[in-house]
Amino acid sequence: MEQYKFILSGGGTGGHIYPAIAIANELKSRFPNCKILFVGAKDKMEMQKVPQAGYDIKGLSIAGLQRKITLQNAMFPFKLLSSLVKSFGIVQQFKPDVVIGTGGFASGAVLKVASILGIATVIQEQNSYPGITNKLLSKKANKICVAYENLEQFFPKDKMILTGNPVRQDLISVDGKRNEAIDYFKLDANKKTILILGGSLGARRINQLIAKEIDWLLSQNVQIIWQCGKLYFEDYKPFSGKENVQILSFIDRMDLVYAAADIVISRSGASSVSELAIVGKPVIFIPSPNVAEDHQTKNAQAIVNKQGAILLKESQLDSEFKFVFESLLNDKAKQEDLSKNIKQLALPNATKDIVDEIIKLVESQKS
C-alpha cells in the first residue's frame, strides 16, 4: 500500500485543534502507515494538545491581528512573512499529498504555501460566516468542507461539500451514560444539572455573570458544573467551596458532562455548536462579541432560526438572563422542543465524510 502523507494545520483554540485531531485519527485508522504532520502557532495550546494525541507538530511564529493599535500589530507583517518562509521549508521537506486547514493562526500560511506549490488543499470551514482568510484561500482550494448551508456567497459552489464539523466520537452516544456521569461528577440524581461552558480558554463575561448570579441560581434547586477556562480558574476557584458547585478549568470527559447536563449555557464557537447538536441538549447561547466577523452570533442565530436554541447577547444579560433561564428551567416542553430541534441539525458523520473527500482528492491525483 502506498504511504500517503498529510499536513493538518489548525489551532489557537480547542475549536480548531480538536477537529484537526479527529480528522488525523480517521486518516490513521484508514491508512495505518500514513505519515501525518501538524503545523501550529508557537506558544498556542496546539503545541501541547497535538503531541498528547500522538502526533508531531511544527510551530510558526504567527498571531492574529488585534482590534486596537499594538506593537503586536506592527510586527504582524514580519511574522507573516517569517511564517510563509518557514511553511515553504516544512511543506517542501515533508512533501504532503494533501494539506488540510481547520482554521486558526497557522493554517492560512500553510494552505497558501501549499497552493503556490501545487499541492492539493482542503479547507474545513467551521462557521456559518467565514473569515477573510478562508474566503481568500478558497479561490485556490480543491475542496471546502462546510458545516452550514447557504455559503455560496462566500465560496465557489462547485468546491463546497456539506459535511458538518468533526466532533469527538464518544459524544455520539451520551444518552446511555447518565448514571455513569452522575457517579463520575458526584452529582445529586434528583437535582437538575446546569453546565456552564466558556470554551477552552474561558469566557470572561459568562464567568462574571455566573459569579454574580450564583446564589440565585442555586436557589432554583440546581447543581452547577462550571468550566471557567484556564485563564480564569484561579479567580473563580473559591466558588467551589459552595455546595452543589464544581469549578473546572478544563473538562476531559466531555461525553460524561454532556450526559449529566439538563441545561447548557455556552459560547457559540463552531465546535461547541456542533457538539451540542450531537448531544441534543437545551442550550442558551451567549456568543462572544470579540471574534472575527462576529461569527459566534451568526453560528448561534443559525440554530435559533431553526428553533434549536436560545440566544442572549452579552448586552442583554443584566436585564434578561434571569427571566430567560428561569422560564426555560420551569418549562419541560420547551426543553424537549429545543433538544429535538437542535439534534435534527446534527451531522454525526462529519469526520468520516471529510476524510472521504480527502481520499477522493488523493486518488484523483494518483490516477
UniProtKB/Swiss-Prot annotation:
Asked if Cell division is a keyword of the record, the answer is yes
- Recorded GO MF terms: UDP-N-acetyl-D-glucosamine:N-acetylmuramoyl-L-alanyl-D-glutamyl-meso-2,6-diaminopimelyl-D-alanyl-D-alanine-diphosphoundecaprenol 4-beta-N-acetylglucosaminlytransferase activity; undecaprenyldiphospho-muramoylpentapeptide beta-N-acetylglucosaminyltransferase activity
Pathway(s) of this molecule: Cell wall biogenesis; peptidoglycan biosynthesis
Q: Please report the name of this protein according to its UniProt entry.
A: UDP-N-acetylglucosamine--N-acetylmuramyl-(pentapeptide) pyrophosphoryl-undecaprenol N-acetylglucosamine transferase
Q: Per the record, what is one GO cellular component?
A: plasma membrane
Q: Which GO terms describe its biological process?
A: carbohydrate metabolic process; cell division; cell wall organization; lipid glycosylation; peptidoglycan biosynthetic process; regulation of cell shape
Q: Sorted alphabetically, which InterPro entries does this protein's record hold?
A: GlcNAc_MurG, Glyco_trans_28_C, GlycoTrans_28_N
The family note in this entry says: Belongs to the glycosyltransferase 28 family. MurG subfamily.
The major lineage groups are: Bacteria, Pseudomonadati, Bacteroidota, Flavobacteriia, Flavobacteriales
Domain of life per record: Bacteria
Q: Which UniProt keywords apply?
A: Cell cycle, Cell division, Cell inner membrane, Cell membrane, Cell shape, Cell wall biogenesis/degradation, Glycosyltransferase, Membrane, Peptidoglycan synthesis, Transferase
Which species does this protein come from?
Answer: Flavobacterium psychrophilum (strain ATCC 49511 / DSM 21280 / CIP 103535 / JIP02/86)
One Pfam family for this entry, by name?
Glyco_transf_28
**Which reaction is the catalytic activity of this chain?**
di-trans,octa-cis-undecaprenyl diphospho-N-acetyl-alpha-D-muramoyl-L-alanyl-D-glutamyl-meso-2,6-diaminopimeloyl-D-alanyl-D-alanine + UDP-N-acetyl-alpha-D-glucosamine = di-trans,octa-cis-undecaprenyl diphospho-[N-acetyl-alpha-D-glucosaminyl-(1->4)]-N-acetyl-alpha-D-muramoyl-L-alanyl-D-glutamyl-meso-2,6-diaminopimeloyl-D-alanyl-D-alanine + UDP + H(+)
Primary location class: membrane
Topology in the lipid bilayer is annotated as: Peripheral membrane protein
Cited SUPFAM superfamilies: UDP-Glycosyltransferase/glycogen phosphorylase
Q: What is its EC number?
A: 2.4.1.227
Disulphide bridges in this chain?
none
Cell compartments where the protein resides: Cell inner membrane
Q: What does this protein do?
A: Cell wall formation. Catalyzes the transfer of a GlcNAc subunit on undecaprenyl-pyrophosphoryl-MurNAc-pentapeptide (lipid intermediate I) to form undecaprenyl-pyrophosphoryl-MurNAc-(pentapeptide)GlcNAc (lipid intermediate II).
Where UDP-N-acetyl-alpha-D-glucosamine binds, per the record, is at: T13, G14, G15, N127, R168, S200, I251, Q296
